[in-house]
Curated annotation (Swiss-Prot):
Summary of subunit composition and partner proteins: Component of the RPD3C(L) complex composed of at least ASH1, CTI6, DEP1, PHO23, RPD3, RXT2, RXT3, SAP30, SDS3, SIN3, UME1 and UME6. Component of the RPD3C(S) complex composed of at least EAF3, RCO1, RPD3, SIN3, and UME1. Interacts with cyclophilins CPR1, CPR6 and CPR7, with the kinase HOG1, and with ESS1, CYC8 and HAC1.
Phosphothreonine: residues carrying this PTM: 394
Protein name, per record: Histone deacetylase RPD3
UniProt xrefs under InterPro entries: HDAC_PDAC, His_deacetylse, His_deacetylse_1, His_deacetylse_dom, His_deacetylse_dom_sf, Ureohydrolase_dom_sf
Keyword Cytoplasm (UniProt): yes
Disruption outcome: Heterochromatin spreading downstream of the silent mating-type locus HMR.
Function: Catalytic component of the RPD3 histone deacetylase (HDAC) complexes RPD3C(L) and RPD3C(S) responsible for the deacetylation of lysine residues on the N-terminal part of the core histones (H2A, H2B, H3 and H4). Histone deacetylation plays an important role in transcriptional regulation, cell cycle progression, DNA damage response, osmotic stress response and developmental events. Is involved in rDNA and telomere silencing and in double strand breaks repair.
Swiss-Prot/TrEMBL catalytic activity: N(6)-acetyl-L-lysyl-[histone] + H2O = L-lysyl-[histone] + acetate
Higher taxonomy: Eukaryota, Fungi, Dikarya, Ascomycota, Saccharomycotina
Modified residues (Phosphoserine): 408
EC number: 3.5.1.98
Family of the protein in this entry: Belongs to the histone deacetylase family. HD type 1 subfamily.
Organism: Saccharomyces cerevisiae (strain ATCC 204508 / S288c) (Baker's yeast)
Pfam entry (one): Hist_deacetyl
Length: 433
C-alpha cells in the first residue's frame, strides 16, 4: 500500500494580523561547532539569517543583538555549580573535570567544545531579552532561533542542550504575566521545560512529539502534572509519519481549547525543525507549510508571543522553514524562488523555498488519534477556569535587559548613522523603494 500525503492548503495572512516583531540574532552563533559528525550544527541559524536578510525581511522588523546572559541570570533556573562548570570546562582541561562531566551528563551527546559557555550565553540572552521586550510592550512577537534548547535540566545537560533558555525566558515573562502557555512542535518531547514547571499552574506546557522507543522517552498521555500543576501539562504522543493534514487536525483543536480555557497572557512557541519531512533524526512527515501553519495559527490569537528555535538536523530544510515562518510572523508569504545568498548552493537542485513531504506511511490511525484527543479534552475539562495569581509588587527590571543605547552600539559607518539604528528602522507597508 502506497500512502499519499494529503495536499495542504496554501497559507494566507490577514492584513489585520500585523505584529511588531523583534528579531534577535548574534553573528557569532554560527562559529560554534559541537564537533565533527555531530548532528547539531549552529551554522543552520546563520543560514536561516542569510535567507531572512536576502528576502528583505529586515525592512519589516527590528533586529537586535542581545547581551549574552550572565551567570547570575542563568542561575535563576540552573544551579550555581552547574553553570560554574560550564564556564570553566574546555576541551583542553576536560581531564580535570572527569567527575563533574559524568555528574552533569556532559560527554557523548553533549560534548565539550571551544566556546561552549559563550554559545550558551548567546542562546540564553536572546530568549531573556526577547521576554523582557514583550514584558515592556516594546514588541508583539520576539524571535530567537538560537534558543529553543528544551532538554536542558536544572543541573544537567541533555539531548544537545546545555542551558534551558526557554525556562529562563518564561521566568522573565512570569514577572509580568499571570499565565504563560508553552507549545512545543519539536519531534522530541520538551522534557526540560515540562519538568521545570510540572508543579505550577502559572505555566501550561503542551508538547506534540513522537512517543515510543524515542529520545527522551518521556511525554506519555498520562503525564499531566502534579500538585498545583495537575492538568497543566499536556502531552500529545504521536507516531511515525504524521502528515500536514493529520497534524493540523490534532494541533488546532488542542490549542484552541487551551487558549479558551487557560487564557494565557503570553505564549512561547518552540519551533524545532526536526518534525519536518526528511530530517536526519526525525520521523515525521511535515512539509514546510504544515510546520509553519502551527506558527501562523498561534500568531492568530494576538497574544504576546516568543518564538524560539530548537532541533532540526537537515540544515537546508531548517533554514528554509524558519525563514518562511519569520515571513509569516511579519505578515508576509514569501515567494518560492530563493533569492541569491551566500549559502545558495546548499538549496540545490530545486533552489526553492519548499520542504516537500515524502511517501512515508502514516502510522497515526484515526482511531488512535481519537483516543488521544478524547483523553486530552477530558483532562482539560479540569482547567476550565483560568487560575488567578495573587497581586505582587513587580521587581525592578534587570539593568542588563535595558535598551541598548546607540552610543554603545557599533561604530558609525560610511552610510551615516550606525548599523544599530538602521536595524531598528521598519519600512512602512506603503513604501515604494
Amino acid at each position: 500500500m502506497v500512502y499519499e500525503a494529503t495536499p495542504f492548503d496554501p497559507i494566507t495572512v490577514k492584513p489585520s494580523d500585523k505584529r511588531r516583531v523583534a528579531y534577535f540574532y548574534d553573528a557569532d552563533v554560527g562559529n560554534y561547532a559541537y564537533g565533527a559528525g555531530h548532528p547539531m550544527k549552529p551554522h543552520r541559524i546563520r543560514m536561516a539569517h542569510s535567507l531572512i536578510m536576502n528576502y528583505g525581511l529586515y525592512k519589516k522588523m527590528e533586529i537586535y543583538r542581545a547581551k549574552p546572559a550572565t551567570k547570575q541570570e542563568m542561575c535563576q533556573f540552573h544551579t550555581d555549580e552547574y553553570i560554574d562548570f560550564l564556564s570553566r570546562v574546555t576541551p583542553d582541561n576536560l581531564e580535570m573535570f572527569k567527575r563533574e562531566s559524568v555528574k552533569f551528563n556532559v560527554g557523548d551527546d553533549c560534548p565539550v567544545f571551544d566556546g561552549l559557555y559563550e554559545y550558551c550565553s548567546i542562546s540564553g540572552g536572546g530568549s531573556m531579552e526577547g521576554a523582557a521586550r514583550l514584558n515592556r510592550g516594546k514588541c508583539d512577537v520576539a524571535v530567537n532561533y538560537a534558543g529553543g534548547l528544551h532538554h536542558a535540566k536544572k543541573s544537567e545537560a541533555s539531548g544537545f542542550c546545555y542551558l534551558n533558555d526557554i525556562v529562563l525566558g518564561i521566568i522573565e515573562l512570569l514577572r509580568y504575566h499571570p499565565r504563560v502557555l508553552y507549545i512545543d512542535i519539536d519531534v522530541h518531547h520538551g522534557d526540560g521545560v515540562e519538568e521545570a514547571f510540572y508543579t505550577t499552574d502559572r505555566v501550561m506546557t503542551c508538547s506534540f512529539h513522537k512517543y515510543g522507543e524515542f529520545f527522551p522517552g518521556t511525554g506519555e498521555l498520562r503525564d499531566i502534572g502534579v500538585g498545583a500543576g495537575k492538568n497543566y501539562a499536556v502531552n500529545v504522543p504521536l507516531r511515525d509519519g504524521i502528515d500536514d493534514a493529520t497534524y493540523r487536525s490534532v494541533f488546532e483543536p488542542v490549542i484552541k481549547k487551551i487558549m479558551e480555557w487557560y487564557q494565557p497572557s503570553a505564549v512561547v512557541l518552540q519551533c524545532g525543525g526536526d518534525s519536518l519531512s526528511g530530517d536526519r533524526l526525525g520521523c515525521f512527515n511535515l512539509s514546510m507549510e504544515g510546520h509553519a501553519n502551527c506558527v501562523n495559527y498561534v500568531k492568530s490569537f494576538g497574544i504576546p508571543m516568543m518564538v524560539v528555535g530548537g532541533g532540526g538536523y537537515t540544515m537546508r530544510n531548517v533554514a528554509r522553514t524558519w525563514c518562511f515562518e519569520t515571513g509569516l510572523l511579519n505578515n508576509v508569504v514569501l515567494d518560492k524562488d530563493l533569492p541569491y545568498n551566500e549559502y545558495y548552493e546548499y538549496y540545490g537542485p530545486d533552489y526553492k523555498l519548499s520542504v516537500r513531504p515524502s511517501n512515508m506511511f502514516n502510522v497515526n490511525t484515526p482511531e488512535y488519534l481519537d483516543k488521544v484527543m478524547t483523553n486530552i479534552f477530558a483532562n482539560l475539562e479540569n482547567t476550565k477556569y483560568a487560575p488567578s495569581v495573587q497581586l505582587n509588587h513587580t521587581p525592578r527590571d534587570a539593568e542588563d535587559l535595558g535598551d541598548v543605547e546607540e552610543d554603545s552600539a557599533e561604530a558609525k559607518d560610511t552610510k551615516g548613522g550606525s548599523q544599530y539604528a538602521r536595524d531598528l528602522h521598519v519600512e512602512h507597508d506603503n513604501e515604494f523603494y
